[in-house]
């Protein structure tokens, strides 16, 4: 007779890590060239002046400057980087 109960192993207990999407630099914050401003899926926010878009729709700064968010019309948001020299 067994003195211990046989214990089965569970097949649960795993989960994938979150994608860490969202705004990484806020309005008025200083960014350097190449800094990620927004990580997103699809173009929720569109690139404006001095902002590039990556293959996974990540928006990044092309020059050093300050982040500026704007609305274009009713349903389009853009993000710009205003160079520090122009301020």
Curated annotation (Swiss-Prot):
What is one Gene Ontology biological process annotated in the Swiss-Prot or TrEMBL record? translation
GO-annotated molecular function: structural constituent of ribosome
Pfam families to which the protein is assigned, alphabetical? Ribosomal_L27 (PF01016)
Q: Which Gene3D superfamilies match?
A: 2.40.50.100
- Family matches, as PROSITE patterns: RIBOSOMAL_L27 (PS00831)
Please give the superkingdom of this protein's source.
Bacteria
Asked whether the keyword Ribonucleoprotein is assigned, the reply is: yes
Q: What do the Gene Ontology cellular component annotations say?
A: cytosolic large ribosomal subunit
The record's region (Disordered) falls at: 1-21
Query: Which InterPro entries does the UniProt entry name for this protein?
Result: Ribosomal_bL27, Ribosomal_bL27_CS
Q: Which NCBIfam families does this entry report, sorted A to Z?
A: L27
**Similarity comment: family membership:** Belongs to the bacterial ribosomal protein bL27 family.
Q: What is this protein called?
A: Large ribosomal subunit protein bL27
- Lineage of source species: Bacteria, Bacillati, Bacillota, Clostridia, Thermoanaerobacterales
Q: Which gene encodes it?
A: rpmA
């Amino acid at each position: 007779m067994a003195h211990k109960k046989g214990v089965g192993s569970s097949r649960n207990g795993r989960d994938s890590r979150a994608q860490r999407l969202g705004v990484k630099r806020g309005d008025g914050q200083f960014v350097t060239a190449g800094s990620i401003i927004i990580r997103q899926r699809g173009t929720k926010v569109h690139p404006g002046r001095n902002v590039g878009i990556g293959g996974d729709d990540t928006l990044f700064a092309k020059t050093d400057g300050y982040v500026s968010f704007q609305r274009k019309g009713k349903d389009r948001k853009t993000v710009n980087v205003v160079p520090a020299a122009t301020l």
